[in-house]
Amino acid sequence: MVRASVLNDCLKSMSNAEKQGKRQVMIRPSSKVIIKFLTVMQKHGYIAEFEYVDDHRSGKIVVELNGRLNNCGVISPRYDLGVKEIEGWTAKLLPSRQFGYIVLTTSAGIMDHEEARKKNVGGKVLGFFY
């Protein structure tokens, strides 16, 4: 399989495992962006926990699913977003205003759109989950 995006492969395998009713999924290869994205998902309760396994190659991540994840995906290319444009993207990508999160990479790190709005920083959109 051709890996166009490691983050895209990660999120699609998690979404497929969730639809099949699996309790855990193994993701390889690993990257820092995937770990930060999973940390944001865990903070909001969409995944139970995850563990990084170092296999002296590219690494693996074992993610424990809790059945709350409906859909997740990557936005490619990574569009630039100002603080004022975040509201428009949430309307495009998420089913409701109170439901789901857009993950941004900013100068202050990888965070969800609500935290970016509070810190008044823009950035590039990585993906979404709800």
UniProtKB/Swiss-Prot annotation:
<dbReference type="InterPro" id="IPR000630">
    <property type="entry name" value="Ribosomal_uS8"/>
</dbReference>
<dbReference type="GO" id="GO:0003735">
    <property type="term" value="F:structural constituent of ribosome"/>
</dbReference>
<dbReference type="GO" id="GO:0006412">
    <property type="term" value="P:translation"/>
</dbReference>
<dbReference type="InterPro" id="IPR047863">
    <property type="entry name" value="Ribosomal_uS8_CS"/>
</dbReference>
<dbReference type="GO" id="GO:1990904">
    <property type="term" value="C:ribonucleoprotein complex"/>
</dbReference>
<dbReference type="GO" id="GO:0005840">
    <property type="term" value="C:ribosome"/>
</dbReference>
<dbReference type="InterPro" id="IPR035987">
    <property type="entry name" value="Ribosomal_uS8_sf"/>
</dbReference>
<keyword id="KW-0689">Ribosomal protein</keyword>
<dbReference type="Pfam" id="PF00410">
    <property type="entry name" value="Ribosomal_S8"/>
</dbReference>
<keyword id="KW-0687">Ribonucleoprotein</keyword>
<protein>
    <recommendedName>
        <fullName>Small ribosomal subunit protein uS8y</fullName>
    </recommendedName>
</protein>
<comment type="similarity">
    <text>Belongs to the universal ribosomal protein uS8 family.</text>
</comment>
